Amino acid sequence: SIARRQRQMCIRDRYKDGDIIIIRYEGPKGGPGMREMLQTTGAIYGQGKGEKVALITDGRFSGATRGFCIGHVGPEASVGGPIALLRNGDVIDIDAKKGTINVRLSKKELQKRRKKWRPKKINFGNGTLWKYAQTVGPAYLGAPTHPGGKNEVKVYADI
């Protein structure tokens, strides 16, 4: 998978200072289930590059993650979000103060890539993971798995 190759790239130290590492197809639908990225961030720090590269993913991070890591990016790659359209060599600008991520591509190029994009083929056609991937909502809504949860706005916890 794309995510597996990206993680292996980090583990094997196949990137350079200033790179932005993209791990996609790890969101609620694409994972499915938003796998933890701690192994990848641990490898980056273990190689002494934690302060020299950024990591962007539609997956998730634990509280142990350090460095310039951006997770829960949505819409996720598996539903055709912008992260699915990125390619090696694309220049990406991250502005942490403004809270923006932009790729330096023309609208025409992005439209061209969107036309060519096809959903990633999943390697399971039935069972629990398939059912989960078919019903789960986006991360920004809490990855709900029931139709009513996608529109639920009431918080039931005392905070």
Regions picked out by a protein language model, each given a short descriptive name:
Residues 33-34, 46:
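Alpha-helix N-cap/helix-initiation motif
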